[in-house]
Each structure stands twice: as structure tokens, then as C-alpha cells.
Regions:
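A short beta-strand-turn-helix
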Residues: 57-62, 67-88
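Alpha/beta-hydrolase fold active-site loops
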Residues: 87-88, 119, 170
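N-terminal targeting signals for export/organelle localization
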Residues: 1-65, 209
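Short, solvent-exposed cationic patches
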Residues: 27-28, 102-103, 200-209
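Structural recognition of the beta-strand scaffold that forms the well-ordered cores
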Residues: 91, 122-123, 147-150
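Thiol/disulfide oxidoreductase modules built on the thioredoxin-like
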Residues: 141-145, 151-202
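Structural microenvironment flanking redox-active thiols in thiol-disulfide oxidoreductases
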Residues: 101-142, 153-160, 198
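Conserved redox-active cysteine motifs that mediate thiol-disulfide chemistry
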Residues: 84, 92-109
Length: 209
């Protein structure tokens, strides 16, 4: 009788393990299945890493960034996943971050040149105050092509930090149309340079965006 009870309990634990394994999450097999294409795209563009973006790190395992939340330019709460559908360069920045301020014009020019149905730059400001300061900064340097998205709780940065992507600011992630990581970079870059644009164009082609 004791043996039968023990076997039943073991079977129940086994079934629970199967159920938990089947639930998608940050490290679950659901993420692996949903974002395997991001890793394939990363492999396809490996030869484009270098020059101005030599520090760009390609995704070696599936990473889903769709749940990263922020407030869009219209003041509505949203997520990266809700705005998926094209290759996107997600850039976390703050007004107190000098390298962030320096690279913002390059991101603006990149959006002006490549932005459209297949690609977009998605900046997320993580200043902890209201949006007045970052808005004034963008206006002062005449940013015309980028929206002011905000995350004063810094949850986006904390999420990327927990995923091993963010060491500081700025941090930039290239994601595919399903919000799956293709690669990321810590520190500033000349994002409108020939090297960066070649990498992004290759990602768009490889991802089928």
C-alpha cells in the first residue's frame, strides 16, 4: 500500500514538472520556441558586427522582450509586444546619461532614413521624474523623428538587467517582429553609421520583416 501511494505521489510530481516545463516564461521552453527565429537571425548577420558597432553582442539563446512595458508618447501604457510587427531598435536612455544624450541625434537620423513598415527606433526614457525634462532635452537638440516614450519606474531597465542585457546606460537591443532578441549593445554607438545601417538592413532581410 505504501509503495502504491509513493508511486502515485511520484507520478503527480512528474506531471506537475511536465506542466511547469510547458509554461512559457523568461527561461521556459515556450520562450525557446517563440524566439528561436531571433537566434537564427543573429547567426545570419554575424559577419556584419564590427567597426562602429564592434561591441554589439548577438543573441546566443532565445530571449523574449515582448513584456517590457512603457508609456507611449500619447500617455498610454503599452508594451514592446503590443507594438511588434517589424524589426525594432529599442534604446533605453536618460537625460542624466551623457553618452545617451550624445547618441540621440544619430538615432534620430537613423529613424529618418530607415524608419517605416519594416523597421523603427523605439527609445524609452527612464528618468524617474515627470516627462518635462526629457521632452525639453529632445526639443533643445531638435529631435524630429523619435517619440518620447517613458518608463519612470525603470522597470524596462530592471528587466533587461535581470536578463543579463543591461550593464548601464545607454543599452540598446535589436529585436525582430515578434519582439525576440537579435542582439544588444551596452554603451553608445554611431547608429546612423554605415556599419550600423548595414547590420540593421541585414537583420531586416534575415528576419523577413
Amino acid at each position: 500500500m505504501k509503495t502504491a501511494v509513493a508511486l502515485a505521489a511520484f507520478a503527480a510530481v512528474g506531471m506537475l514538472g511536465v506542466a511547469l516545463y510547458g509554461i512559457g516564461g523568461p527561461d521556459g521552453n515556450g520562450e525557446a520556441e517563440a524566439c528561436a527565429a531571433g537566434v537564427q537571425t543573429a547567426k545570419a548577420i554575424e559577419s556584419f558586427v564590427g567597426g562602429e558597432i564592434a561591441a554589439f553582442q548577438l543573441a546566443r539563446k532565445p530571449v523574449d522582450l515582448s513584456q517590457i512595458a512603457y508609456v507611449n508618447a500619447d500617455g498610454a501604457a503599452t508594451t514592446i509586444g503590443e507594438n511588434a510587427g517589424r524589426v525594432t531598435l529599442v534604446n533605453l536612455w536618460a537625460t542624466w546619461c551623457a553618452p545617451c544624450r550624445k547618441e540621440m541625434p544619430a538615432l534620430d537620423r537613423l529613424q529618418a532614413e530607415l524608419g517605416g513598415e519594416a523597421f523603427a527606433v523605439l527609445p524609452i526614457n527612464i528618468d524617474t521624474g515627470d516627462a518635462g525634462k526629457p521632452r525639453a532635452f529632445l526639443e533643445s537638440i531638435k529631435i524630429e523623428n523619435l517619440p518620447l516614450n517613458t518608463d519612470p519606474a525603470m522597470a524596462s531597465f530592471e528587466t533587461m538587467k535581470k536578463r543579463g542585457l543591461a550593464l548601464g546606460l545607454p543599452v540598446t537591443a535589436l529585436i525582430d517582429k515578434n519582439a525576440c532578441l537579435i542582439g544588444h549593445m551596452n554603451g553608445p554607438a554611431e547608429w546612423d553609421s554605415g556599419d550600423a545601417k548595414a547590420l540593421i538592413k541585414a537583420a531586416i532581410a534575415a528576419a523577413g520583416a
